[in-house]
Design a protein with these regions (language model features):
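Alpha/beta-hydrolase fold nucleophile elbow
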Residues: 115-126
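Short glycine-enriched nucleophile-adjacent loop
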Residues: 129-140
Length: 152
């Protein structure tokens, strides 16, 4: 797992964040950012919506940290700085919606290896909510979840 960029100048979030490149089971490079601290009450996973990116959730992660939780956010394949599947890098294409589950699996594997504090919770917005619901149905070890609109 190599370091990935995290643009703190637009993040407006906690300053101690880190970003990593993760590789999914089908070899797609995705970006994840996290704020993990040892005396945390648990971890809140943040699943963004379509056309969103990690830095948009900086304020959210700052609030999460202020209430005593670690957080981890993902750029889905074809979104943010994650790898694009087509030549035109401005298009956020995915072959099958279920492919996003590979992104979830890579994120969970990373969080498990890094020993992110449990229990785990999920905040999922729009498309991230649809991805999150499927992941929960597939066994994502989440204790509680918040889904927000519009796609939800």
């Amino acid at each position: 797992m190599k370091n990935a960029p995290l643009y703190e100048d637009i993040l407006e979030g906690p300053l101690d964040g880190q970003a990593r490149w993760l590789i999914t089971a089908d070899n797609v490079k995705i970006r994840a950012a996290y704020w993990n601290f040892s005396n945390s009450n648990g971890t809140i996973f943040v699943f963004p919506g379509r056309n969103e990116y990690i830095e948009k959730y900086g304020r959210t992660c700052k609030k999460i940290q202020s209430i005593g939780y670690s957080s981890i956010v993902i750029d889905w394949r074809g979104q943010g700085l994650s790898e694009r599947l087509v030549k035109n890098k401005l298009i956020g294409h995915v072959n099958l919606f279920q492919d996003y589950q590979r992104d979830v699996n890579a994120l969970v594997l990373f969080a498990t290896k890094k020993r992110f504090p449990e229990p785990w919770f999920l905040f999922a917005h729009s498309m991230g909510g649809a991805i999150g619901l499927r992941a929960i149905n597939n066994g994502l070890p989440i204790q509680k979840v918040i889904f927000s609109a519009p796609m939800w």
